[in-house]
Amino acid sequence: ILYLEAIQDPGNLGTLFRTAEAAGVNHIFLSRNTVDPFSPKVVRSTMGSLFRLPFSIEEDLLSLCERLKSAKVQVFALDLSGKKAHFQASFQGPSAFLFGNEGNGLTKELSQCATEKLLIPMEGKIESLNVATSASIVLYEAVRQRRYIKEEG
């Protein structure tokens, strides 16, 4: 499951849809203040993923987060305040991934709802990556753990 809060750039949203489909995500939840998924640039940049991957626009991502946690879904927030690197987390069970606005990240409330806050370690003077790039890194770590670690073990 992918949660997207207040994504504003149509190209980012389109890339997030394509990446989510390629990584086997089964549903995307969008906050109401996310760019229109049917805007021409989003539709073009999804390369059709918009029409194959189930998604919904949610009024209240926070209550949805609480319901998922009650259903024993691990909820991971990508947040600069995270204390654990994304590759140190276990994505073996049911998981939801929270990604926030390009400039401001996740709201404090949604970030605090997460089971665990993660970060992508950075070298040099870079503080963060583009939201679509970050999602790609984390989703493919989940794919690696689920597919390849099981096969090796």
Where are these regions (language model features)?
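Post-transcriptional modification and biogenesis factors for structured RNAs
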Residues: 1-153
